[in-house]
Amino acid sequence: MKKGIHPELKKAKIVCACGAVYETLSTKEYMTVEICSKCHPFFTGQRKFVDTEGRVERFTKKYNWEIK
């Protein structure tokens, strides 16, 4: 590797919306994430309800579809 062209790595603190905190190396010192392995449905085995009604309504209005 060439010297002097790579960004400096620092200890990074990553905080999830569920409250989980992770430490790793990164060029940034602090990051926030919305979902992690402690709260993601794939890893927890639970399903979470995601409100997508606004997106569906926008789609049906855009393409003039009727919901049956």
From Swiss-Prot:
Binds 1 zinc ion per subunit. Part of the 50S ribosomal subunit. It comes from the Bacteria. This is Large ribosomal subunit protein bL31. NCBIfam families: L31, PRK00019.1, PRK00528.1. Belongs to the bacterial ribosomal protein bL31 family. Type A subfamily. GO terms for cellular component: ribonucleoprotein complex; ribosome. Zn(2+) binds at residues 16, 18, 36, 39. GO terms for biological process: translation. Signal peptide: none annotated. Its cofactor is Zn(2+). Binds the 23S rRNA. GO terms for molecular function: metal ion binding; rRNA binding; structural constituent of ribosome. Keywords: Metal-binding, Ribonucleoprotein, Ribosomal protein, RNA-binding, rRNA-binding, Zinc. Pfam families: Ribosomal_L31.
